[in-house]
Amino acid sequence: MTDAHHADDVRYQPLSEIDPEVAQAIAGELSRQRDTLEMIASENFVPRSVLQAQGSVLTNKYAEGYPGRRYYGGCEQVDIIEDLARDRAKALFDAEFANVQPHSGAQANAAVLMTLADPGDKIMGLSLAHGGHLTHGMKLNFSGKLYEVAAYGVDPDTMLVDMDQVREQAIKEQPKVIIAGWSAYPRHLDFAAFREIADEVGATLWVDMAHFAGLVAAGLHPSPVPYADVVSSTVHKTLGGPRSGIILAKQDYAKKLNSSVFPGQQGGPLMHAIAAKATALKIAGTDQFAERQARTIEGARILAERLTASDAKAAGIDVLTGGTDVHLVLADLRNSEMDGQQAEDLLHEVGITVNRNAVPFDPRPPMVTSGLRIGTPALATRGFDATAFTEVADIIGTALAQGKSADLESLQARVTKLAEQYPLYEGLEDWTIV
């Protein structure tokens, strides 16, 4: 076929020509990511190699089943890729078994519950209102509809998970599954204590490490793998990979977990996403990755310290638990004139993206909230060091402390300067099809 024919063939036209509306929106999103500071704790920036793997011809391939046992022909190359992803996941986390097919963290969690419990069985996880996740028993989620739920919470004085209270709740409720994990909790969990409690009441222990998996991979957070029967995770938060899920487990659960993922929860796996997972997991084993995770935690601690400064305290701002061990900080605005929505909007005006978040015992509605969840993974990926994190922490602290009286133009100029000092995706236009 000649070049002239290619020019009129929709198979060969670039996105900018075939669908300028979508291309323009993608370009706009690229500009947003470059020009603002991303501080949503569950977001990150994937490397060029991960973008390339996910945007590859693997998107064309159906591969129901598992390597060596597919229901389609032509799976020789995708078998290699899935085996690489599984082996890398097991090696990275020192796990006996890995399933890398879940399309998302929620899909992984659904498969875990299908494996460990029957509909109507009782599960026990951290309350959503106290920092848990939708899939740990929220009543509108499948986990709250299919299973009986007995949640545990945090201590009202310390805002920490009290293991004595967890034990009392477990003895009282006798759950089939105990869940350790969170989406908004700034401290380490005691996995050994959870294991002891699970053994005492005859429950299986499932740890959801979606948020802190990257810290575990870097050796900067206690690993749940030696203690849990099953561990699930996303790949796109601190791990910095594609939006997807993985499951790790003791070998005893392998067959049932595989069956719960396929055909239990999903049909064909997304092989382009699995390739991107494999690449992200390889990167997660490098010294560069570990150094980035160290900066992630350092940045969060710098932010927590700034939000406990005198001007923040005078404005009624507090930091949940007084600090952080991980990649996020929870700003407590219950005593502030601003609610979570107003604080989120204020930071958005100066070019910092965060998300409002309920705090334990929150008096405000869920769509308003009395808190902010602020994370550092994306900025650490961007290259931020202690000096840069100190600057962005001061921008946030000043904005929240001064509220409506803050000089937003000046704060926005400081954000722009940081974004320019730490450029993102340089040359991206040259190596994508946009």
UniProtKB/Swiss-Prot annotation:
Swiss-Prot/TrEMBL site (Plays an important role in substrate specificity) positions: H236
Keyword Cytoplasm: yes
Catalytic activity field: (6R)-5,10-methylene-5,6,7,8-tetrahydrofolate + glycine + H2O = (6S)-5,6,7,8-tetrahydrofolate + L-serine
Residues with PTM N6-(pyridoxal phosphate)lysine: K237
Listed EC numbers: 2.1.2.1
PROSITE patterns associated with the record: SHMT
Binding locations of (6S)-5,6,7,8-tetrahydrofolate: L128, G132, H133, L134
Entries under CDD domains matching the protein: SHMT
Gene Ontology CC terms: cytosol
Pathway(s) this gene product operates in, as recorded in its UniProt entry: One-carbon metabolism; tetrahydrofolate interconversion; Amino-acid biosynthesis; glycine biosynthesis; glycine from L-serine: step 1/1
Subcellular location per the Swiss-Prot or TrEMBL entry: Cytoplasm
GO biological process: glycine biosynthetic process from serine; tetrahydrofolate interconversion
A Pfam entry, by short name: SHMT
Cofactors, names only: pyridoxal 5'-phosphate
Transmembrane segments: none
Main location: cytoplasm
InterPro entries: PyrdxlP-dep_Trfase (IPR015424), PyrdxlP-dep_Trfase_major (IPR015421), PyrdxlP-dep_Trfase_small (IPR015422), Ser_HO-MeTrfase (IPR001085), Ser_HO-MeTrfase-like (IPR049943), Ser_HO-MeTrfase_PLP_BS (IPR019798), SHMT-like_dom (IPR039429)
Cytoplasm among keywords: yes
GO molecular function, one term: glycine hydroxymethyltransferase activity
PANTHER family per the UniProt record, alphabetical: SERINE HYDROXYMETHYLTRANSFERASE, SERINE HYDROXYMETHYLTRANSFERASE 1
HAMAP family: SHMT
Biological function: Catalyzes the reversible interconversion of serine and glycine with tetrahydrofolate (THF) serving as the one-carbon carrier. This reaction serves as the major source of one-carbon groups required for the biosynthesis of purines, thymidylate, methionine, and other important biomolecules. Also exhibits THF-independent aldolase activity toward beta-hydroxyamino acids, producing glycine and aldehydes, via a retro-aldol mechanism.
Subunit structure: Homodimer.
Recorded family membership: Belongs to the SHMT family.
Protein name (Swiss-Prot/TrEMBL): Serine hydroxymethyltransferase
Organism field: Corynebacterium efficiens (strain DSM 44549 / YS-314 / AJ 12310 / JCM 11189 / NBRC 100395)
Gene name as annotated: glyA
